[in-house]
């Protein structure tokens, strides 16, 4: 029997140590197996899904960014690189931001609102570098239809990137044009071509769908 004061300290400590150790020993292999299964499933879906899977992944990525749910994909990026040595998911998802660049250029050419033009000119350079939030919250989302057009443009680019099996050697962190520096050998030009197509598609969808030009 331990003194009451000592028992008060040691009981919770020992309980935590024992249960924590058991949990690590029992659950760590299970967690590893689940992570590997997710990575394998993602790779299989991209490999076999081709155009359709690429379009769906990229076309729905901007709404995920709005809610912050895209952060949940980080472990998948990590597992893909660890399991295969490359990441085929990130180049697909990066096309979502590229489609938005095209949409923003279309808005820039059509709008007569000086303030909106100024916002776009300030946000486009970082958009090209893969930082999409200024364009989302400052341009496409408030206008409505350009946001949809950006998603559609990204879907077109993502479909091609998936079909061409473009992959990067990094887990996450950069997107847009800088991502081209990390693309696997032999796929860089295909990534840049997909980038160009996504910009054009985002531009055309925005031009066709139109938008209500805000008053000054």
Residue ranges and their predicted role:
Residues 1-60, 173-216:
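Signature of multi-pass transmembrane helix bundles
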Residues 2, 26-30, 68, 85, ...:
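Short coil/turn residues that cap or connect secondary-structure elements
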Residues 12, 16-32, 62-71, 100-108, ...:
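Transmembrane alpha-helical segments of multi-pass membrane transport proteins and ion-pumping complexes
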Residues 42-47, 61-68, 90-91, 118-122, ...:
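Short, amphipathic, aromatic/basic-enriched membrane-interface segments that mark the entry/exit
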Residues 54-75, 79, 88:
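Long, highly hydrophobic alpha-helical transmembrane signal-anchor segments
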Residues 69, 125-129, 171-172:
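Short hydrophobic alpha-helical membrane-embedded segments
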Residues 74-154:
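Helix-loop-helix junctions within the multi-pass membrane cores of secondary transporters/permeases
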Residues 76, 122, 134-216:
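Transmembrane alpha-helical segments and their short flanking loops
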């Amino acid at each position: 029997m331990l003194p009451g004061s000592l028992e008060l300290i040691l009981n919770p400590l020992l309980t935590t140590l024992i249960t924590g150790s058991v949990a690590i020993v029992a659950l760590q292999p299970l967690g590893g197996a689940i992570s590997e299964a997710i990575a394998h499933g993602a790779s299989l879906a991209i490999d076999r899904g081709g155009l359709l899977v690429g379009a769906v992944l990229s076309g729905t990525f901007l709404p995920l960014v709005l809610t912050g749910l895209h952060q949940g994909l980080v472990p998948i990026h990590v597992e893909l690189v660890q399991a295969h040595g490359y990441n085929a998911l990130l180049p697909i998802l990066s096309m979502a931001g590229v489609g938005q660049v095209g949409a923003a250029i279309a808005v820039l050419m059509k709008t007569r609102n000086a303030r909106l033009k100024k916002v776009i000119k300030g946000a486009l350079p970082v958009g090209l570098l893969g930082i999409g939030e200024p364009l989302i919250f400052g341009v496409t989302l408030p206008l409505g239809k350009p946001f949809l057009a950006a998603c559609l443009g990204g879907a077109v680019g993502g479909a091609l990137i998936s079909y061409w099996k473009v992959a990067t050697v990094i887990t996450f962190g950069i997107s847009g044009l800088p991502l081209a520096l990390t693309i696997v050998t032999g796929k860089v030009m295909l990534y840049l071509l997909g980038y160009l197509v996504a910009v054009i598609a985002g531009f055309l969808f925005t031009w066709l769908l139109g938008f209500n030009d805000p008053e000054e």
